[in-house]
Amino acid sequence: MRDSFLQKAIASAKDRTSLLEEIAGNCSPKPGRPSLSSSIREWVYRVGGAVIAEYKRCSPSAGAISTLDPVSYVQATRDASAAYSVLTEPNWFCGSIELIPYFARYKPVLAKDFIVSETQIRIAACMGASAALLIMEALTPRELQELAAAASRYGVEVLVETPDASHAVEASRLAPGSIIGVNSRDLKTLRVDYEAMLREVSKAREQLPGEVILVAESGIDSPDKALKAFKAGAQAILVGTAFMKNPQLREKILAELLQIP
């Protein structure tokens, strides 16, 4: 059977980890990193919802997305974003851990990769990341617990990405205190089902404790879709491709979000 994209990405991440161990041993987590969850809550209080703007130059589903440089991206998104999600995966997403420090000057940074080891979390902390993405489907329950605990030791918050409400509830149980994401993209096939994501966000919001921050991820490429995600129960949305490809669309979405009642 042909390996899924997720299986390939996990294998690649494990190979890269061995190359990162020496770097991790020689670095210290940066002090004074801002809190991702606090920034999201502040935006929810101020305007009713938060945007995590993702810097993503390419992807396995879309190929090359944009050549927009980090300076231009920050200038375009800084005033209306609660945080940045920075792709650090190099092979499919054209990412790098070296991007983190620049974005961390302005907002809390979510380091986004297929994280399978404590080494990756430590390096993210050393580079200035406030939070790290843990993909539930890429980890066993024990691995998720161990990596969440490692993140806590380094002062790194965790966003656990899940495919549906039942996994979201389980993730919150396994990694208490984590931010929970529901992704509309199937990581095995790379297909996006935005409507299914809305249903799962709504179910997750009903089942999760009120203090758990819920994030809607992927497939949000218009103001209407953004607002529907908030109405379904997400406190934050993560938007990548739409912000990278289309400056006009980016401005429309951000302007609309600033008017959330």
Curated annotation (Swiss-Prot):
Keywords from the named record: Amino-acid biosynthesis, Aromatic amino acid biosynthesis, Decarboxylase, Lyase, Tryptophan biosynthesis
Protein's pathway: Amino-acid biosynthesis; L-tryptophan biosynthesis; L-tryptophan from chorismate: step 4/5
One MF annotation (Gene Ontology) recorded for this entry: indole-3-glycerol-phosphate synthase activity
A Gene Ontology biological process term: L-tryptophan biosynthetic process
Pfam families, per the entry: IGPS (PF00218)
EC number: 4.1.1.48
Catalytic activity: 1-(2-carboxyphenylamino)-1-deoxy-D-ribulose 5-phosphate + H(+) = (1S,2R)-1-C-(indol-3-yl)glycerol 3-phosphate + CO2 + H2O
PANTHER family associated with the record: INDOLE-3-GLYCEROL-PHOSPHATE SYNTHASE, TRYPTOPHAN BIOSYNTHESIS PROTEIN
Family that this chain belongs to: Belongs to the TrpC family.
Protein name from the UniProt record: Indole-3-glycerol phosphate synthase
Organism of origin: Aeropyrum pernix (strain ATCC 700893 / DSM 11879 / JCM 9820 / NBRC 100138 / K1)
